[in-house]
């Protein structure tokens, strides 16, 4: 599949914020069979992918949608019928057995001259997805990360202090940043956190009380930029230090927290 890419412009829809990753993904699809975009829920992965689908002949499958998942009960048969399209697979960590099938489909396509631009994979849990895909798709996939909006994306050609102030106050999740007012933005963030803690995290396996994770997440926010003191956090939560490490690993895996090495050069 030949994918035309114009790197001098960003893909843009009226009323949407340009994402700097869009042209990079398009370029990567032109020379990789598969591209994976990792990022927390609501960071804009699906919006970015659907915007790309407007430029390329594509189909979109959400692995959290039972109907879409049913279509892939025989993945090779279904996907080979769409070998001329870019297949977008959203929340693919919900279907870990799919990766081995993707490997066979990609290798078959290479033999038949359809090497690149086959799959755009979206995932919200980095470690699981990386482990599942790296074993099956080594040499066939490129990984990228989409985080929240950054200043370059929210600022127009003219410097706008209000936009920048809103970014610092509301954060980089698009729905929070673009809310009609600060109150609605706060409501969105509150609901997002509650849903993540009470619904999304349990579906990934961990059985940790939502209230405990909320307290832990809040303490991490107050400790931003500081050296992690696991013992202090453990004492505050009434758990062992090793439990704090487990909680932190979970937050990092869900791309909700960034962890930097103490020895990282500045």
Predicted regions and their residues:
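Short glycine-rich substrate-engagement loop in P-loop NTPases that contacts/grips substrate
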Residues: 58-86
């Amino acid at each position: 599949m030949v994918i035309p890419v114009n790197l001098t412009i960003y893909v843009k829809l009226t009323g949407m914020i340009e994402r700097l990753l869009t042209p990079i993904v398009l370029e990567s699809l032109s020379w990789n069979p598969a591209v994976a975009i990792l990022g927390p829920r609501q960071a804009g992965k699906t919006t970015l992918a659907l915007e790309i689908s407007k430029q390329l002949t594509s189909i979109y499958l959400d692995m959290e949608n039972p109907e879409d998942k049913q279509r892939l009960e025989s993945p090779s048969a279904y996907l080979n019928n769409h070998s001329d399209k870019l297949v977008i697979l959203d929340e693919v960590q919900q279907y870990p057995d799919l990766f081995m099938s993707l490997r066979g489909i990609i290798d078959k396509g290479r033999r038949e001259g359809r090497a690149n631009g086959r799959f755009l994979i979206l995932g919200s849990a980095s470690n699981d997805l990386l482990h599942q895909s790296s074993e099956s798709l080594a040499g066939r996939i490129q990984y990228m990360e989409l985080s929240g909006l950054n200043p370059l994306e929210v600022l127009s050609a003219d410097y706008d202090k209000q936009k920048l102030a809103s970014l610092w106050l509301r954060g980089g999740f698009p729905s929070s940043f673009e809310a009609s007012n600060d109150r609605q933005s706060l409501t969105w963030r509150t609901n997002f956190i509650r849903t993540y803690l009470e619904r999304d995290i349990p579906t990934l396996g961990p059985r940790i009380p939502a209230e405990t994770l909320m307290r832990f997440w809040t303490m991490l926010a107050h400790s931003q930029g500081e050296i992690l003191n696991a013992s202090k956090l453990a004492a505050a939560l009434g758990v062992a230090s090793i439990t704090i490490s487990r909680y932190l690993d979970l937050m990092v895996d869900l791309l909700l927290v960034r962890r930097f090495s103490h020895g990282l050069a500045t």
